[in-house]
Amino acid sequence: MNGAVPMLAIDGPSGAGKGTVAGLLARRLGWNLLDSGALYRLLAFAAVNHGVDLTNEEALKVLAAHLDVQFVAADGSHGQRIILEGEEVTDVIRTEQVGAGASQVAALPAVRDALLQRQRAFLEAPGLVADGRDMGTVVFPDAPLKIFLTASAEERARRRYLQLKAKGADVDQSALLEEIRERDERDSQRAVAPLKPADDAILLDSTEMSIEAVVETIIRHCERQGWDV
């Protein structure tokens, strides 16, 4: 890892607000942004489009290595537009169905290996904010600042419910809660790169915090690193 480039790793479970927080921090700091979860969502989405079974590890490995994807800076909660094979898929890949597929393919060792260098390539000047589930433990283990952002499963389900309702979706909050609990178990129990805080990560529980408060808290930690914020 390029130690001369400032690096902030944000990990945490599904629905903790990592993507929104990372996007806001990247804009605030003027840094590059890596939404690693989007890569796994893109792979699951592309696999379905190309008729690749989500359990076919070898085929998924090949697809992961050749994903034709572009991340374009933009306004909005995620801070970027995502272009896959020439078509914008920014919102399409955010569905619960694609998320479940992403969690499934992310458990495959060959897939994680195929995407590892692709993720590390995002580390460029002036700095990088990376969010995911193994940023501080596997992808960027030497990151000088690591945040593990979490919230109760109930609060994460509530946030997701409000988010989906705002988009006009017909959703059941209790079903969302069950899905979140199942995904937490799957992500934390997988054999490769399980979801867990890095030993040197700062734990931040956002259950009772606003997005703005979370961002400001992390900014204070950035200041302690001596970074220009």
UniProtKB/Swiss-Prot annotation:
Keywords: ATP-binding, Cytoplasm, Kinase, Nucleotide-binding, Transferase. Pfam families: Cytidylate_kin. GO terms for molecular function: ATP binding; CMP kinase activity; dCMP kinase activity. It is found in: Cytoplasm. Transmembrane segments: none annotated. It comes from the Bacteria. It is an enzyme of class 2 (transferase). InterPro entries: Cytidylate_kin, Cytidylate_kinase_dom, P-loop_NTPase. The keyword Electron transport does not apply. ATP binds at G12, P13, S14, G15, A16, G17, K18, G19, T20. GO terms for biological process: nucleobase-containing small molecule interconversion; pyrimidine nucleotide metabolic process. One of its GO terms (cellular component) is cytosol. The keyword Oxidoreductase does not apply. Belongs to the cytidylate kinase family. Type 1 subfamily. This is Cytidylate kinase. The gene is cmk.
